[in-house]
C-alpha cells in the first residue's frame, strides 16, 4: 500500500493525489506538517512535501512520484503511449512548473501571506511570466484537456497551478497574466470532475489555518 504524505493546501500534493485517484490506485494519506521539521527531514532530505512511502522505500518530488506511479501502475494511463505525444505532455509540465509556477511563487509571500515583494522582483517576475505564458499558449491545446483530447498528468498539475498563478498575479501585479489563455473555461471543465471537486474543497477548507500558521 502506498502512503502519500503532505497536506491539502499544496498544489504539488494535490497533483500527486489526483493522479492516484484518477488511476484508481489504493493509497493511504498522512498529513505531514510543519515543513522542515526533523520528522519530515528524515523522510524527505530537502524538507519538502509531498513524498510517498512505497514497499521499496520513500520517493520525493512530485513529478518523480507521478512518473513512478505511471510506471508501476500502468492502468488508466496519464501519459500517451506514443513517445512524441508523451514528450509533449512532459513539455507542457516543464513550461507550467519550471517556467510559470516556480516563477510566480516569488509573488506568493505578498499574495497570500501578508508579506511584501519589491518592485524590482515584481517587474522581473512579470517579464518572465509573460514570456513563459506565451510559450505555454503556443503549445497547450485546451481541447478539452491541456494536451488535447485525453486527460494527462499535465492536467493533474495545471488544475492546481493555474488558480494560484492567476490569484498571485492579480493581487500583486494588478493583472491576471493567464487571462489571455482559455484558462477560465478549462478550469470550469476540469472542476466538473468529482475528484477535482473533492480536492479543491479540501484545499479551500485547509487554507485559512495554513495561512495563520505562516503569518502568526
Predicted ranges, named:
Residues 200-216:
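Acidic/histidine-enriched, glycine/proline-rich intrinsically disordered or flexible terminal extensions
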Residues 1-126, 137, 144-146:
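GST-like domain detector, emphasizing the conserved glutathione-binding G-site
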Residues 60, 93, 161, 199-200:
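Tryptophan-centric aromatic hotspots in well-structured domains and transmembrane helices
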Residues 96-192:
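GST-like fold's C-terminal all-alpha helical module
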Residues 88-91, 185, 198:
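Short, solvent-exposed alpha-helical surface patches in well-structured domains
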Residues 11-15, 182, 195:
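Conserved alpha-helical elements of sugar-nucleotide-dependent glycosyltransferases
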Residues 78, 197-199:
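Acidic/polar loop patches that form or flank catalytic/metal-binding clefts of enzymes
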Amino acid at each position: 500500500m502506498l502512503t502519500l504524505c503532505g497536506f491539502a493546501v499544496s498544489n504539488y500534493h494535490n497533483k500527486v493525489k489526483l493522479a492516484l485517484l484518477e488511476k484508481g490506485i489504493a493509497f493511504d494519506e498522512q498529513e505531514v506538517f510543519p515543513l522542515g521539521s526533523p520528522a519530515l527531514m528524515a523522510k524527505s532530505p530537502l524538507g519538502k512535501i509531498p513524498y510517498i512511502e512505497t514497499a521499496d522505500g520513500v520517493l520525493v518530488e512530485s513529478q518523480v512520484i507521478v512518473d513512478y506511479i505511471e510506471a508501476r501502475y500502468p492502468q488508466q494511463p496519464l501519459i500517451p503511449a506514443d513517445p512524441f505525444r508523451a514528450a509533449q505532455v512532459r513539455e507542457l509540465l516543464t513550461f507550467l512548473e519550471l517556467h510559470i509556477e516556480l516563477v510566480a511563487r516569488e509573488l506568493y509571500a505578498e499574495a497570500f501571506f501578508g508579506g511584501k515583494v519589491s518592485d524590482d522582483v515584481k517587474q522581473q517576475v512579470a517579464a518572465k511570466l509573460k514570456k513563459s505564458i506565451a510559450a505555454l499558449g503556443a503549445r497547450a491545446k485546451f481541447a478539452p484537456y491541456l494536451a488535447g483530447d485525453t486527460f494527462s498528468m499535465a492536467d493533474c498539475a495545471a488544475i492546481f497551478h493555474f488558480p494560484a498563478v492567476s490569484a498571485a498575479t492579480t493581487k500583486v501585479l494588478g493583472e491576471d497574466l493567464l487571462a489571455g489563455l482559455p484558462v477560465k473555461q478549462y478550469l470550469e471543465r476540469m472542476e466538473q470532475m468529482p475528484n477535482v471537486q473533492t480536492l479543491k474543497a479540501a484545499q479551500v477548507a485547509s487554507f485559512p489555518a495554513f495561512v495563520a500558521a505562516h503569518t502568526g
